Amino acid sequence: MRHNRHINHLGRTHSHRKALLSNMAVSLIKHKRIFTTLAKAKEFCKYVEPILTRSRNDTTHSRRLVFRKLCDKYAVSELFREIARKIGDRPGGYTRIIKIGNRLGDNAATCFIELVDYNELMLKTAHGGATNKIRRSRRSSPHKRDINERNNIIQEDNAMTKTIEEAKGE
């Protein structure tokens, strides 16, 4: 019986799941936003939140503990140098899951998972930027609406990466 097992195995062995979550964490630290399935994202939050909390205290011991999970020295240095500075005053909840819809091939629920303090578009709207209302026709099909929403999210993501690259260049 499966009593008291609080981990989603994601259909993988222990070593495969450990490698998957570690690689996803490195990608999130490097790119600040990743695209994945909802089940992986929910399990990934449980994995990465303690790592981000550990990075707030920059000691040799905490660096070694984080490196044990990530196994990428560039990701560890970026985590302690840049990300820890931004999340230093936040008491928790460093990641955000944005549901996108279902994948066309296998109908899996997909989402973006991102670091909360790195989404400039949401930060601008939260600090007083006006949002535009979306007007929808009654005749539009839900399938077309899902595709349009995905395209809008991808365009926003591309625009955000361009602004981040321009900011790094300056």
Swiss-Prot record:
Gene Ontology biological-process annotations: translation
The organism of origin for this protein: Azobacteroides pseudotrichonymphae genomovar. CFP2
Pfam families documented for this protein: Ribosomal_L17 (PF01196)
InterPro entries: Ribosomal_bL17, Ribosomal_bL17_CS, Ribosomal_bL17_sf
Keywords assigned: Ribonucleoprotein, Ribosomal protein
Repeat as UniProt keyword: no
Signal peptide extent: none
Spans traversing the lipid bilayer: none
Gene: rplQ
Family: Belongs to the bacterial ribosomal protein bL17 family.
SUPFAM superfamilies (alphabetical): Prokaryotic ribosomal protein L17
Protein name: Large ribosomal subunit protein bL17
HAMAP family xref list: Ribosomal_bL17
Assembly and binders: Part of the 50S ribosomal subunit. Contacts protein L32.
GO cellular component terms listed in the entry, alphabetical order: cytosolic large ribosomal subunit
Top-level division of the source organism's lineage: Bacteria
MF terms in GO: structural constituent of ribosome
